[in-house]
Amino acid sequence: MRILVFLWLGLSSLFAVDATLEVVKKFANMPSIIVEDSSTREVERGLTLRVYKMLVGDLKVSSHFNVQEGGASSFDMVMDYGAYRQKKVDLVAKVKAGREGSGILAELRLYDVNSGDSVFAKSYTVAREDRYPFVAHKMAIDINNYIKAPSIDWMNRFVVLSKYTAPSESQIVVADYTLTFQNVIIKDGRLNIFPKWANEQQDAIYYTKYLTKPTLFRYNLYTGESRKITESEGMLVASDVSADGKKLLLTMAPHTQSDIFLFDTQTGTRKQLTRYPGIDVSAHFIEDERRIMFISDRLGYPNVFATGLDGSETVEQMVFHGRNNNAASAFGQYIVYSSRESSNEFDTNTFNLYLVSTKSDYIRRLTANGVNQMPRFSQDGETVMYLKHNGAQSALGVIRLNYNKSYLFPLPSGKIQSMDW
């Protein structure tokens, strides 16, 4: 796992630290865990090492553990709890993995040093060897659940992204959050952009393909079927999907300038929600899908606004900091957005992420430099994923909001156009 780690700007947090306190209460301090390699056969060691390294990385990203890397220790060895206590270790995780057909069978045994007990022994299988990161992600989630820490279930979700492979050509890729696992699902020599998960199950996506007109397709990951949904002049992007999967928020430009439309996937009908003679893009459902948040240049520069679903065009400004806020995501009363902070005519501009509350004037900067765009909240609101660009290269960034830490996972080659998780 390739990780670049940064301390978050500032030591205070807009989000509550109750979650951290619950973990500390159970173990007196942040629990210390040591991960050990329990492979016994040479043929197991390479695969076990990959799962082991990924698990160590996952536990660090969770921010709920002090993580140590241990040596070899088979399942058959008698546990010397006293020796671990002297090293101030609270938990021991023993891992091994082997091939089973074309897939993997892995095992995890967790020991609680303080109680002197074997906590659990679990087996994990995946059908393909290249999916081994998800074995480690599931292990990390189970260990995290044992200490009753806030959920890290987001680690086991797929990320879908579009990456450029040549001029006017891009692929759609499904990956894990570290970009270690990658599976190309759309590759046809065309421009395929703006993938969006179609449902909570993550078994289908919407994406835009540039044909004679921008055309929206729905692709089923399990059957490989692509079905045309609609097309439009100018531009066409599916920016959000309702919880029941029946409604889409589309950015369309049927008459030169882009506006926001509500599309019914059952009937194929659409309703225009904005009619501004400028640019309205990137809408997202907010407030239990009673309203939408979107980006508009109606102040003379891009900013974040909200309006209802009734098409009344009554618009509310949501963000009052920054003069070029071009992307946003919402969770409850919080908005995370990307703001341009430089005006370089001949060089790359700086875009930083900010977190604000709609209930107060509190604001926090989440990134310090570079090009940071397309922020996305996790389902529990505790984590933000975003894109970081550096020249022709890209990385997925993960910010753990409660713990003042962020992580970068570089894409080995190519540049990410957009992503969803």
From Swiss-Prot:
The reply to whether Translocase figures as a keyword in the UniProt entry is no
Please give an example of a GO cellular component term from this record. Answer: periplasmic space
As for subcellular location, the record says: Periplasm
**Pfam families membership:** TolB_N
Q: What domain of life does the native source organism fall in?
A: Bacteria
Chief location of this protein within or outside the cell: periplasm
Q: Which InterPro entries does this UniProt record tie to the protein?
A: 6-blade_b-propeller_TolB-like (IPR011042), Tol-Pal_TolB (IPR014167), TolB_N (IPR007195)
Cite the entry's keywords alphabetically. Answer: Cell cycle, Cell division, Periplasm, Signal
- Biological process, per Gene Ontology: cell division; protein import
Signal sequence range: 1-16
- NCBIfam families, per database record: PRK04043.1
Functionally, this protein is described as follows:
Part of the Tol-Pal system, which plays a role in outer membrane invagination during cell division and is important for maintaining outer membrane integrity.
Q: Which PANTHER family match?
A: PROTEIN TOLB, PROTEIN TOLB HOMOLOG
HAMAP family registered for this protein in UniProt: TolB
Subunit structure of this entry?
A: The Tol-Pal system is composed of five core proteins: the inner membrane proteins TolA, TolQ and TolR, the periplasmic protein TolB and the outer membrane protein Pal. They form a network linking the inner and outer membranes and the peptidoglycan layer.
- Say which family it is in: Belongs to the TolB family.
Listed name of the protein: Tol-Pal system protein TolB
Source organism (scientific name): Wolinella succinogenes (strain ATCC 29543 / DSM 1740 / CCUG 13145 / JCM 31913 / LMG 7466 / NCTC 11488 / FDC 602W)
